[in-house]
Amino acid sequence: DFLYGGDERYRLCQEVILGIGGIAMLRALGYAELRVFHMNEGHSALATLALMEEQAGSLPDRTYTELEVNAVRRRCVFTTHTPVPAGHDRFNADLVAQVLGKQRADALARLSVMDGALNMTELALRFSGFVNGVSLRHGEISRAMFPNYTIAAITNGVHAATWASAPFAELYDRVLPDWRRDNCYLRYAVDIPLAIIRQTHLAAKRELLNHVRWLTGVQLDDKVFTLGFARRATGYKRGD
């Protein structure tokens, strides 16, 4: 299996497994009383259809009631990350019927989320009670892309203790002992002498180059300025 590179049918099948299969997996594991489902990107949006089917008690040949729709909305939260239209999956209605079956395709049509094609982001937006982008600017862009929805902004962050390299974590432990408990203490890193920062950076760089050598057999020179790009090589990631 592979994440990227398949055709449209392959991609839709992946998203069926993630969304509908994800809900089925949680139920099989005994998680029957979950109160909130958080979807990241539209790839998992079919989870809303699975929850709608649960709410109705079956896959009905009727329009879902407002009560059923609102019950699903109260339980779904959606985060959109992608600021360009190409990042929002759309699947032709005929393909949706082939993969999901006519009954489910008709249900999606009655939910007004399929007009010739199923827009996965639109599906997630329509049936989530709270939606957010991942920065103030991205929130603005998302509201412009999807003007019919209320989209908040929550700035992305990282878990500092996980992302700090071992040499820097050891340095912070020495000079900023509370940084793991409260990341705000990292603001005082500006007072660390530059010579110590450089020494720690070189230690981290050597660890990275040793890891590259272990993985590939290639020995890079630690005296050469080196840039890494830990993302997919796609235009909107702004590798330039």
Task: Describe each model-derived feature in a short phrase.
Residues 1-240:
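Catalytic cores of carbohydrate-active enzymes across secretory and cytosolic contexts
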